[in-house]
C-alpha cells in the first residue's frame, strides 16, 4: 500500500454482475463503507429500475450517494467526484475503508484519476430551456446541425463528422448549459491516481451475463417496476433526464398507450444487454482492472483473493 495516499477499493462490472453482493460482503470483512458509483441510484423513488440496494441487503453496512436527489434534479461526474472525494476523506479519517461499487465508468474514472471536470449542473428551469432549444433543432438534418455548431464552435465542428449527430448534439448541449465551448473544455487524464486503489472487476461469459440480465429484468417486473414508472409519470417526472434511464424510458410508451407491454419488455432486455456490453468495453479499454471470474470463483473465493491482495 502507498501510505501517502488514502486506500480505496473499487468494484466495477456490468449491470447484473453481482457488484452489490460482493461489496457488502467485502465491507464486512475489511471494516468498510460503500460509496455508490452508479449515476442512477442517487435518485429517490427510482428503486426497482435502478436495482437499488435495499436496507435488508445492506445488512448494517453504511451506504453513501443513494437517495440523495429528486428525479427532476441533475447529477454529473463533476458532482459525483466532489461528493465522493469528501466521503473518502471522512470514511478514511474514521479508520474505515472506502469501497466504491458501481458501473458508471466515467464516474469511477474521474474519481480514480486526476480528472479536472467542469460543473455542468443546471437548475430544472435552466434544463427546461436547454431542452426547448435542443428540441427546436430536431428538424435540422445532419449537415444543417453541423453548420449550426460551426457558428459558435468551429474547432468542435472540424473534429466531429456531420453524420455523427450524437456528438454534434453533445457539443451544442454543452454550450447551451455552460456558455463555454466543448473544444476548450479542460479535461485531462494524467494517469496519476489520486488514491492507493485496488481496482477490481467482475466478469463472466457473455452468454451467462445476458442470461442474468434477462432474469433480472423479469424479477424487476415481478417486483413492480411498471407501477414504479407509472407513479413517477403520475408525479410529473416523465420528461426528466433521469427518466431516460434504461428501465424507465422503455415503459413510458406503454403507459401512454404507444406500445404494447411485451415489445417494451423486449426492448428493455435488449437495451440492458447493449449497455452491459458498453460497460465492459469501457472498463477493459480505459481502466487497469484486476478481473474476478464469477463463473469459476465462488463469492468466498473472490473475497479471499481480495483480502489477500489488501494484506
Swiss-Prot record:
- MF-aspect GO terms: ATP binding; tRNA dimethylallyltransferase activity
Q: Which cofactor does it need?
A: Mg(2+)
Q: What does this protein do?
A: Catalyzes the transfer of a dimethylallyl group onto the adenine at position 37 in tRNAs that read codons beginning with uridine, leading to the formation of N6-(dimethylallyl)adenosine (i(6)A).
Source species: Staphylococcus aureus (strain MSSA476)
Where is the stretch described as Interaction with substrate tRNA? 38-41, 166-170
What is its quaternary makeup?
A: Monomer.
Q: Please give the Pfam families that the UniProt record associates with this protein.
A: IPPT (PF01715)
Write out the residues that bind substrate. 15-20
Q: Name the enzyme's class.
A: transferase
Print the keywords alphabetically.
ATP-binding, Magnesium, Nucleotide-binding, Transferase, tRNA processing
- InterPro entries per UniProt: Dimethylallyltransferase, IPT, P-loop_NTPase
Where does the entry annotate site (Interaction with substrate tRNA)?
Answer: 104
The protein's matches in Gene3D superfamilies, at most eight in alphabetical order, are given as: 1.10.20.140, P-loop containing nucleotide triphosphate hydrolases (3.40.50.300)
The molecule here is called tRNA dimethylallyltransferase
Binding residue positions for ATP: 13-20
Biological process (GO) annotations held by this record are:
tRNA modification
Highest rank taxon of the organism = Bacteria
Q: Catalytic activity, per the record?
A: adenosine(37) in tRNA + dimethylallyl diphosphate = N(6)-dimethylallyladenosine(37) in tRNA + diphosphate
PANTHER family linked to this entry: TRNA DIMETHYLALLYLTRANSFERASE
Family indicated by similarity: Belongs to the IPP transferase family.
Q: What is its EC number?
A: 2.5.1.75
